[in-house]
Amino acid sequence: MFKQLSTLFSGLVVSICCQAQQTFPQNGAYDERPGRYAFTNATIVVDPKTTIENGTLLIENGLISQVGKQVKLPAGTVVVDLKGKYIYPSLIDLDSDYGMPEAKRDRPAGGRQTPQLESNKKGAFGWNQAIQSENDASLIFTPDAKKAADLRKIGFGTVLVHSHDGIVRGNGALVTLTDEAANKALLNRKASAHFSFSKGISSQTYPSSTMGVVALLRQNYYDAEWYARTPKAKEANLSLDAFNQIKTLPSFFETGDKYSVLRADKVGDEFGVQYIIKGGGDEYQRINEIKATKATLILPLQFPEAYDVTDPWDADVISMAQLKHWELAPGNASLVARAQIPFAFTSAGMKNKADFWKSIKTAVEYGLPKEKALEALTTLPASLIKAEGQIGSLKPGLLANFIITSGDLFDKDNIIYENWVQGKKFILAPINAPDIRGTYLLTINNQPGGKLEIAGSPEKPEYKVIVQDSVKITPKAILSNELLTLSYQADKKVTGTTRLTGWLTGTTLSGEGILPNGAAVPWNATLTQKFQQTAAADTTTIKPKETGPILYPFVGFGNEQLPKSETLLIKNATVWTNEKEGILQNADVIVQNGKITKVGKSLAAPSGAKTVDGTGKHLTSGIIDEHSHIALFTINEGGQTSSAEVRMSDVVNPDDVNIYRQLAGGVTASHLLHGSANSIGGQSAMIKLKWGASQSEMVLPDVKTIKFALGENVKQSNWGDVARVRFPQTRMGVEQVYFDHFLRAKEYAKSWKSFNSTSKKVAANAPRRDIELDALAEILDNQRSITCHSYVQSEINMLMHVADSLKFKINTFTHILEGYKLADGMAKRGIGGSTFADWWAYKMEVKEAIPYNAALMYHQGVTVAINSDDAEMARRLNQEAAKTVEYGGVPEEEAWKMVTLNPAKLLHVDNRMGSIKAGKDADLVLWNAHPLSIYARPEFTMVEGAVYFDRKKDEEKQKSMQQEREKLIQKMLNDKAEGKPTQKPQAAQPKMWHCEDIVGVHTEHEGHR
């Protein structure tokens, strides 16, 4: 007796102590019960690697107390016999907007908004509204009963929530899906930090591009570091304060496609941050590069629906990338797992959360191991946010967050009966539903009423009423415990509904009904045949899904295998060397290890070399396009008058089909320029056209150039009436932009030089790192070259005089259609001209352009290049070079140099490309005719010894592409015939960028546009 009283007293003390820890009063008596439940005779999946057969799970006060085969149950425990059912940890979603307010952008009256250069956010926050480090999800979290119920229904118990707005989004909060107050749901108010490439609802003009987003984020990291080490900073900045507090938390980066994953990781590498990256579902397309990031991924589960290709004209607009992604996307997780890349799943982005398990099971069908799928939903997400001591498995001391299922979680017909969150039960389906399935003889008011067929599952029966032997009616039905309610219209000719309510007794349903005329009558249904369960498919014999190959790049004309450098002997060709040897007849060239090793006659083939007969053909170095905008996701950052901080290398698009098309025209390298939206543009990128290679393999990192611009674009002449805010608005103002920025860059460089020269460096005294001024300081130090968009003589003279006075060098004037007027001044200063062959009169700025421009500059000693600035023109740059022979009598060899050696000189890469010489890169083109002829076509184009375009193989590729398209179209037609959902075809035309093009970043580019 004394022992019982002691135990009771101890329980009261614990209960009272628990109450004492609560700060919220309760209206009424406190419920002192401990919520002690034991779930026995269950298959308990403790974690993906541990399963207990016929085990017991004991929970108490919202926590797991014990788990195992032999569990001693305390007195007063409520025992639930699960009779072999399964228990799993509740699921975790790391990318949720549950309970978060919707971010809404203010719309200006009349739909026209004056450019907003500065932040309009009130308070001592940072200068850019897209940086929202101060956002604290825990302060704006409000439980949403409906959304919580929807998530619990598919098995989730905990979610990581954050505000999905902005580039830096602040900190996330870990919350449970209880139906109680936020105070109960909140597990960790500062669980994570969140980032994206979308500026969200910010109405500021900057950034206006993805590369601008990257630059802003990089600068924010540098500013936060400076702010933290500089106690005497001249400003208070709550955004930087908050950023320094959250940057040590697990950092999540939301992206939209495979290249954004790589871009995010590149930012993280610069600052020693390993982001956890939410992908776009196309990671399989660049799996090796993504694995090299060592990032953990968050994978979406919204797979593309088949396109409705019934109409062949509709089918024609679908790209190969769209077709292939539809086929391969469900296997993304399987391929990620096979590559040993850790990942978690998210339900974010799903059109219908009810399709969650359908997508998971589809991923399993495509080869994803069940253990990996469970890990991606439980233990791994818990470990990523350092919450494995609270959630993610069924171990003592963790929250009692678990689900009870009918069987294996990944089985086709599995049912989730209950979801327990913090020890509280939420019923999703009746756990011991009576099995009333079968065929019944229906009698209403002692008269035959047809048949009642009940199929489906015990938990979710499916009903059919059969009248007049053949007419099947689907009634409205509600089964609660053993009480059944049916309502249906028995005869369409008679208005009204028959309503039946009854209960199960043995094998008979009986009760009372109401006829359409209002009469109350008895009814019953007698079981005549038990439901015959269809045998489940043997999953061990299911064949893996057959899919086509992954292409590199993942578009039409992509390669199944990337070309490799070959050892070649090209014999008896007419070789245009671009060297002092000139044009060699019947000459040989040897290529080894990506380099030209020998040039001469009657050369012996190296061991293992493939011999190419060049008889009657011309061999040249590859064409170099000095001014190009291909292979980019965006080209202008026009949010400010200077965007020297942005880098075109951050937005290189290796999937652009123009790479392949230009290889077909003999182009092997392109200089990718920022557009002409502002006076000081972004840092350019030079790429080799290695079709199918990664971004890093294409970009030449040692080529450091930058785009400047003059003229009407930079002063926003054609941007509309509202664009009257950004400086400069006149050509006079453009001059002051250059003076202002370079004078500040001089002072900036001077301050760093002074700091670096001190013997004892104190971090607090270091200047603030400014990546915009870094680029300009490199120009002053001759470490970065300027290519300047230019048309009018007066402005060109202005910039040359500014450069003279500030002691920096202009490398190249591009366009330069009035270059013939000042070629002597350009030659004197060593400035090159990269121009069009014969474009003129297409706008007022070029009204005095002439087709003899290139020749006149050449004759004055200017290094002249012919460029494209156009994806289509670049396919025929050999013909553009030929025009200089027509207009001005430029010698043929010199004309050819204008698209090969001269652009190499202007880009300072003539030591490795631009001519055929031993030791240079084997970037070669074999033409079927004189390269300046309009009839000339490349037989093959190689880059560093690898053939990336071969005309014969191209013909074969076109045939195989057509066969692959038709195969995929037939698969889509089969999907539609089987009743699966389809979507309307959407044309996916690649963007053809030009200097003036602007694209916003309120939403990031998608991978399959």
Please state what every model-predicted region is:
Residues 42, 399-432, 573, 921-961:
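C-terminal cap of metal-dependent C-N hydrolases
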Residues 33, 103-104, 111-126, 134, ...:
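His/Asp/Glu-enriched, well-ordered alpha-helical/loop segment
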Residues 22-24, 29-35, 44, 48-90, ...:
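Histidine-rich, glycine-flanked metal-binding segment
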Residues 410, 508-554:
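Edge beta-strand at a domain terminus
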Residues 29-37, 428-441, 453-458, 560-568, ...:
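N-terminal helix-cap/turn-to-beta initiation motif at the start of protein domains
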Residues 442-504:
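Central antiparallel beta-sheet cores of small beta-barrel/beta-sandwich binding domains
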